[in-house]
UniProtKB/Swiss-Prot annotation:
One cellular component (GO) term of this entry: nucleus
Protein species of origin: Caenorhabditis elegans
Family: Belongs to the nuclear hormone receptor family.
Protein name: Nuclear hormone receptor family member nhr-2
Keyword Nuclease: no
InterPro entries for this protein: Nuclear_hormone_rcpt_NR1 (IPR050234), Znf_hrmn_rcpt (IPR001628), Znf_NHR/GATA (IPR013088)
Ranges for region Disordered: 57-112, 138-184
Binding region for DNA: 215-297
NR C4-type ZnF: 218-238, 267-285
Function according to Swiss-Prot or TrEMBL: Orphan nuclear receptor.
Keywords of the record: DNA-binding, Metal-binding, Nucleus, Receptor, Transcription, Transcription regulation, Zinc, Zinc-finger
Domain of life: Eukaryota
Biased composition (Polar residues): 57-83, 90-112, 138-147, 159-171
One annotated GO biological process: positive regulation of transcription by RNA polymerase II
Length: 472
């Protein structure tokens, strides 16, 4: 074939490629290794780089690309004769091209380090290689450790990255598998102890400790003891159980029978199951030494019994019934007073129906009406506070709040409202000095004690709020 001249070759336009900077294949493949494939711009850039690296070289000579003697084939290695011919026609001193199968960048002094790993190519494994070998992870082109070929070591030295230098074949040792290393038998040489402990006093020491722990344990169930109770070291649970059993004089019966023993098979008297069988627990309390006579049966001494309040007699009850009947007939709680005139008329009829009250009021009509005007405000306040009568025609907010203060149940019945109204009338008319006043107060106390059991001292509080305090 006719050799081709690089000057006569037609090169494609590459507007975006930097002249003189051939690309580096990421997978270590040769790229434009034949000088005949280089462009004139690349050769000119290389000449300028060589001039910067080696100052003082001649620059007036022109560089001519060498003629290719062989056919242009990709990925072909140029012979040394072509390198010598190219360098012979140039006055500058340029280093010869390396014979390695790699591309060299003219912009750097040395070949740049590649950051990518070589392309992993699957090869049939000859032997099982340890997965813990670092070189097997970094490069798959590494030969088997058993192969002692120096050519393979030289080839692998150019592929390895960040690893230790390859060792020679003479220093290599066969590397075993993880199974072989973990299952290698180990020879352990027994050694005699350097000291001889003395256990002569061990039993004495343990017996002393056991006696010490027994001092703080309940003799019935084995729980933590709180002291001597009824003559025996026991806990609070067994002490209370024994005291209650003696106080109530209870006769327990075991379900296992009379021949039951304190064991796990029958009835165990320990901390966990001491409450399962009360008969065996009480029997063990007596067996360990608890004394019945040490239990004080009557803990409380005889105290003077407070005299109870005397129940009201028949005469007082009749007076209260008379007052209650007059109240229900003239102004019961279910009746709503609509006006002041209606209220004055109802109060006047109520007072006239009770002889004990009418005898204390004046006989004159004008004086009677004036007395009724004085007691009307208090009676209306009592109805508004303890009944469902709203009393819309009279403003008595302050007296109502005074009566209701501190009372839980503010709804009273007819008897209670009648007694409160009668007591209020007596306090306004003669200051509560009449004999009937005491009967009304006792009747109110007795009635409140039956309907307001949780209201302690309710009668005394109400008596203090009646009378002149409601008219202020």
């Amino acid at each position: 074939m006719v050799p081709m001249n690089p000057e006569l070759m037609h090169y494609p336009n590459q507007p975006h490629m930097m002249p003189g900077y051939p690309m580096i294949n990421a997978y270590q493949q040769s790229y434009l290794q034949n000088p005949a494939q280089w462009t004139p711009e690349m050769l000119l850039c290389m000449q300028m780089q060589m001039q910067q690296m080696v100052p003082g070289t001649a620059t007036n000579s022109t560089y001519m690309p060498p003629q290719s003697k062989n056919t242009v084939t990709p990925n072909a290695t140029s012979p040394l004769s072509q390198i010598s011919d190219r360098d012979s026609g140039n006055d500058t001193i340029s280093p010869p091209l390396t014979s390695q199968n790699s591309a060299t960048t003219p912009n750097y002094h040395n070949q740049p380090q590649m950051q990518l790993t070589p392309l992993q190519q699957a090869k049939p494994e000859k032997e099982e290689i340890s997965p813990y070998a670092i070189n097997n992870i970094l490069s798959s082109t590494q030969s088997s450790p058993d192969n002692g070929n120096e050519a393979d070591d030289k080839e692998n030295s150019s592929v390895r990255r960040n690893t230790f230098p390859a060792s020679s074949a003479s220093t290599k040792k066969p590397r075993g598998t993880p199974y072989d290393r973990t299952n290698t038998p180990m020879t352990v040489v027994p050694q005699m102890p350097q000291f001889a402990p003395d256990f002569s006093n061990y039993n004495l020491t343990m017996n002393a400790w056991s006696e010490f722990f027994k001092k703080d344990r309940c003799m019935v169930c084995g729980d933590n003891s709180t002291g001597y109770h009824y003559g025996v070291q026991s806990c609070e649970g067994c002490k209370g159980f024994f005291r209650r059993s003696v106080h109530k004089n209870i006769a327990y019966v075991c379900t296992k029978g009379e021949n039951c023993t304190f064991s796990y098979e029958n009835c165990a008297a320990n901390r966990g199951v001491r409450t399962r069988c009360q008969a065996c627990r009480f029997a063990k309390c007596l067996a360990v030494g608890m004394n019945r006579d040490n239990v004080r049966v009557n803990k409380e001494t005889d105290k003077d019994v407070k005299p109870s309040v005397a129940s009201p007699n028949f005469e007082m009850t009749s007076q209260v019934k008379e007052l209650t009947a007059a109240f229900v007939a003239n102004m019961p709680c279910s009746t709503h007073l609509t006006s002041g005139t209606h209220a004055i008329g109802a109060i006047k009829k109520f007072i006239e129906s009770v002889p004990a009250l009418s005898s204390l009021l004046p006989k004159d009509e004008k004086a009677l009406e004036m007395s009724i005007q004085k007691v009307m405000s208090g009676i209306l306040a009592i109805r508004a506070a303890f009944t469902f009568d709203p009393i819309t025609f009279y403003s008595c907010e302050n007296p109502v709040n005074l009566l209701r203060g501190g009372i839980r149940n503010t709804v009273f019945n007819d008897c209670e409202v009648a007694l409160l109204s009668g007591i209020h009338i007596l306090q306004i008319v003669n200051g509560g000095v009449a004999e009937i006043f005491t009967s009304y107060c006792q009747g109110l106390r007795h009635q409140l004690s039956q309907t307001h059991l949780q209201e302690i001292g309710l009668c005394d509080r109400l008596l203090m709020r009646l009378g002149p305090y409601l008219n202020q």
